[in-house]
Amino acid sequence: MHEWGLSEELKIQTKQMIEIAEKELSIMRNAIDKEDECILCKMEDIHHMLANVQTLAATYYIQAYLSPYTESSSFITTAIQHLSARKHGALIVVERNETLEALIQTGTTLNAHLTAPLLESIFYPGNPLHDGAVLVKNNHIVSAANILPLTKSTEVDPELGTRHRAAIGLSEKSDALILVVSEETGRTSFALNGILYTISL
């Protein structure tokens, strides 16, 4: 049985952020009756605060989602940190309970022991393997330059790039966890069960 509870430090941070959001909601509720007050700015502030709460929680849960399926989760997160800092785009699929062979168009077979430097080198711009997805199973990189199914959901942000659409697409069809690094912003996220979560590593 997995332990999904938040750490004590994260509980405190999350509660503090929620309390601030509650105060802002109260201020906004009172401002509705005032003709000289605009609540749109307040709504944007609250949206930003709640997004930060989600990012905080998602960052914690990523380890809980990964650790039962690979002992190399720390190598994966280290690689993600470095790739993000350099704005090197990346797409990493972690196979969990369901096999992915029927869903992925296999690229180049590697069957290599997973290390952070190897992951980083695969996604180095110009590397022939960097455009597709890496498939991780247990503690091994099974293959690279894999092609994933793209989401067809009309609810997905139209500004999302191919990597993010591929991550969501595979997560809609399997229990895999897919990590993404944006090459435009360096922002990191993961897709699970058809939902994309922003994380800060």
From Swiss-Prot:
Its EC number is 2.7.7.85. Residues 54-201 form the DAC domain. InterPro entries: C-di-AMP_synthase, CdaS, CdaS_N, DAC_CdaS-like, DisA, DNA_integrity_DisA_N_sf, DNA_integrity_scan_DisA_N. It catalyses: 2 ATP = 3',3'-c-di-AMP + 2 diphosphate. It is an enzyme of class 2 (transferase). Disruption phenotype: Spore formation delayed by about 2 hours, about 20-fold decrease in spore formation; 2-fold decrease in parasporal crystal formation, 30% decreased c-di-AMP levels at 18 hours growth. Double cdaS-disA and cdaS-cdaA mutants are viable, but neither double cdaA-disA nor triple cdaA-cdaS-disA mutants can be made, suggesting c-di-AMP is essential. Its cofactor is Mg(2+). Optimum pH is 7.5. Coiled coil: none annotated. Pfam families: CdaS_N, DAC. Induction: First expressed at onset of sporulation, maximal transcription at 18 hours during sporulation in mid-stationary phase. Under control of sigma-H factor; in B.subtilis is under control of the sigma-G factor. Keywords: ATP-binding, Nucleotide-binding, Nucleotidyltransferase, Sporulation, Transferase. GO terms for molecular function: adenylate cyclase activity; ATP binding; diadenylate cyclase activity. SUPFAM superfamilies: YojJ-like. GO terms for biological process: cAMP biosynthetic process; sporulation resulting in formation of a cellular spore. The N-terminal region (residues 1-69) is required for activity, unlike the B.subtilis ortholog where their removal increases c-di-AMP production. Belongs to the adenylate cyclase family. DacB/CdaS subfamily. This strain no longer produces parasporal crystals, but can be made to do so upon transformation with appropriate plasmids. One of 3 paralogous diadenylate cyclases (DAC) in this bacteria catalyzing the condensation of 2 ATP molecules into cyclic di-AMP (c-di-AMP). It has slow DAC activity with ADP as a substrate and may have weak ADPase activity. Required for efficient spore formation, whereas in B.subtilis, it is required for efficient spore germination. It is produced under the control of different sigma factors in the two bacteria. It is also required for parasporal crystal formation. Probably forms a homohexamer. This is Diadenylate cyclase CdaS. It comes from Bacillus thuringiensis (strain BMB171). The gene is cdaS.
